[in-house]
Design a protein with these regions (language model features):
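Juxtamembrane/interfacial segments around transmembrane helices
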Residues: 155-157, 194-195
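A structural "domain/chain start" motif
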Residues: 10-80, 85-97, 102, 166, ...
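Short, solvent-exposed beta-strand-to-loop segments that form ligand-recognition rims
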Residues: 162
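Surface-exposed short loop/turn segments
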Residues: 12-13, 89-155, 165-179
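Soluble periplasmic/extracytoplasmic beta-strand elements of cell-envelope proteins
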Residues: 36-43, 67-71, 79-81, 106-114, ...
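Sec-dependent signal peptide recognition
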Residues: 1-3
Length: 213
């Protein structure tokens, strides 16, 4: 009983903050024109979470849209217009007795998660006697189209892809293999979208698409 109490008393709790990664342009100054844009539909077109027993809620697409809006704003190249919370925004304007002065977007960004998957690989050393390991791998690919709101023309398109891997190894009874890590889904999706936004910014910088004068 004393031993159990001693072990319970030795439990420790730690925490730390982690700086989220940003798109490349977030760290560079910019004084040029910014595109007023909004984000339209962003759907999960991959087979992930779309099986026979799916509840029909597109959580992956919704997560991707949230990540995209964040990286677009942090890129310092766009005026990002919120179209998801129109009712709440209108209500707050009324509470302030102010008329809304909503901006219109020049472009709407639409996108899809075109590929998404998880896999696990493992190995053993001397039939597992000397150790064994497991690697969890997550892969994601997204496509984004820039659509002119007046003409419905797709003026620019980009793709982004990323892969995340988590490895653990147990050697002669020490260490342990990791259980399923669901955070890899968000990490690899963020990586792919961040890469796509980098390509969008590069397109502006080389004149492939640009704000209206």
């Amino acid at each position: 009983m004393i031993a159990i109490m001693f072990l319970a008393g030795c439990a420790t709790e730690t925490s730390t903050t982690v700086a989220p990664k940003q798109v490349t342009s977030a760290a560079t100054p910019y004084s040029g024109a910014k595109n007023p844009i909004s984000v339209g539909k962003f759907d999960n077109r991959s087979t992930f979470l779309r099986g026979l027993f799916s509840d029909g809620v597109d959580r992956l697409g919704s997560q991707a849209k949230t990540i995209l809006v964040t990286h677009l704003q942090q890129s310092n190249r766009f005026v990002v217009l919120d179209r998801e919370n129109m009712t709440e925004i209108q209500q707050e304007a009324k509470l302030r007795n102010k008329d809304q002065k909503l901006k219109g977007a020049q472009f709407v960004l639409t996108g899809d998660v075109t590929e998404f998957g998880r896999k696990e690989t493992g190995d053993q050393q001397l039939f597992g006697i000397l150790g064994r390991g497991k690697t969890q791998v997550a892969y994601s690919k997204v496509s984004i189209n820039v659509v002119n709101v007046l003409t419905s023309e797709v003026v620019f398109s980009v793709q982004g892809a990323g892969e995340y891997a988590l490895s653990n190894r147990e050697i002669i009874g020490f260490g342990g293999t990791a259980s399923y890590d669901s955070t890899l889904n968000g990490k690899v999706l963020d990586l792919a979208i961040r890469e796509a936004v980098n390509r969008l910014v590069e397109g502006i910088e080389r004149g492939a698409w640009k704000p209206e004068s």
